[in-house]
């Protein structure tokens, strides 16, 4: 069945307006109105060709837009708001997906990957041991530091309490010397008195 495509039809147009526009070009079997275009099925292909040849570029009553009239190709699909030409059928050939067999991995690659994974796991397992050693070494004081601390403690002056104790416990040097001189003077005086007593004659002794 021959079909005619009418494009750029006014949006407010109806089937009656299309019939008036195509009046005198044969018998019309069906009119399918869309938004901005229409498809008209003629009974005779000659009538459709004559209408396409004569009415292309002419205006419809009540509109200043020139219509597009041409032979339709296929059934209409969707709405054409801008009044473009009839959409063409796109042949959608089914795409054949070539199923390629999965590639076989060589054994050498698998071995290399297994070695890498083993080396990574071993390095990860060894790393916490090294960190614990480093922490223990950093926390444990070195012998050199202990010697320096002992030397600084021995050189550091005594606190105020220790000084007072040492001062109160040790007798002054001048006082000791004075006591010694006094004791020596007393001993000398005692010896002299004894000697004088022994030398002086007793009152009862006869004189020479």
From Swiss-Prot:
For this protein, the record's PROSITE patterns field holds: RRM (PS50102)
Q: Which UniProt keywords apply?
A: Differentiation, mRNA processing, mRNA splicing, Nucleus, Phosphoprotein, RNA-binding, Sexual differentiation
- RRM domain residues are 2-74
Q: What does the entry's PTM section describe?
A: Extensively phosphorylated on serine residues in the RS domain.
**Name the UniProt record assigns to this protein:** Probable splicing factor, arginine/serine-rich 5
What is one GO biological process annotated to this record?
Answer: sex differentiation
Per UniProt, the ranges with Basic and acidic residues bias are 128-153
Functional summary from the UniProt entry: Plays a functionally redundant role in shifting germ cell sexual differentiation in hermaphrodites.
Q: Specify the signal sequence span.
A: none
* Localisation per UniProt entry: Nucleus
An example Gene Ontology CC term for this record = nuclear speck
Source taxonomy: Eukaryota, Metazoa, Ecdysozoa, Nematoda, Chromadorea
